[in-house]
């Protein structure tokens, strides 16, 4: 079975407070990837999630941009992506780490809940693929955590379904991931 992890495809990262043209451009690619998933693919989403104390966190001090506040429009998974999954629901997770069905919320760049799931359930997968936003922050954090949790697992990142904070940061991060034996396509 394949695991497809879609990182932080949320409104604030696409066309909201931290949105970009590059992020908007990958939405159709991610939708297509979801639509093409079959019954042998488990799709998991992550959602960057912040609360009223964001300004007091290290991230809030270093990135003082209001984004992905819990239960706001900017926090929601982009509608094209959530609708694609509703139209093609692959497998549904019943796991306490996943608060909202196949979605895990996270308050940091990398998700320890996702890694706990991989440590427990990784033996059920033949491969893991990652895509989403932002390549140079949350995607790379989760990919390298997965590499540490499952050192012998084939892991792929689809670069056509990722966007970074800048094109240069995106490309540099893809190079780093290749160095860590991640298959970048």
Tell where the protein language model's regions lie, with residue ranges.
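Conserved N-terminal glycine/acidic-rich loop preference
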Residues: 103-141, 163-185
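Short internal beta-strands
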Residues: 44-47, 154-161
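Extreme N-terminal starter segment of soluble prokaryotic enzymes
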Residues: 1-4
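Histidine-anchored nucleotide/phosphate-binding helix
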Residues: 31-36, 140-150
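Active-site alpha/beta core segments
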Residues: 28-127
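A short helix->loop->beta-strand "cap" motif at the edges of active sites that frequently abuts
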Residues: 39-41, 150-154
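Short, glycine/acidic-enriched loop or turn micro-motifs at the edges of active sites
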Residues: 10-11, 51
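Acidic/histidine-rich helix-loop elements
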Residues: 14-22
């Amino acid at each position: 079975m394949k695991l497809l992890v879609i990182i932080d495809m949320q409104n604030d990262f696409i066309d909201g407070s931290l949105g970009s043209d590059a992020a908007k451009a990958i939405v159709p690619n991610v939708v297509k990837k979801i639509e093409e998933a079959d019954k042998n693919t488990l799709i998991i989403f992550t959602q960057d999630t912040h609360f009223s104390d964001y300004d007091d966190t290290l991230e809030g001090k270093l990135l003082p941009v209001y984004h992905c506040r819990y239960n706001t429009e900017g926090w929601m998974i982009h509608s094209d992506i959530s609708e694609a999954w509703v139209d093609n629901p692959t497998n549904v997770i019943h796991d306490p780490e996943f608060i909202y069905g196949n979605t895990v919320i996270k308050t940091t760049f990398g998700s320890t809940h996702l890694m706990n799931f991989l440590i427990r359930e990784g033996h059920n997968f033949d491969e893991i693929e990652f895509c989403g936003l932002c390549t140079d922050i949350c995607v790379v954090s989760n990919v390298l955590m997965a590499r540490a949790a499952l050192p012998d697992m084939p892991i792929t990142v689809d670069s056509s379904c990722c966007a970074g904070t800048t094109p240069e940061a995106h490309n540099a991060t893809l190079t780093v991931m290749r160095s860590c034996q991640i298959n970048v396509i």
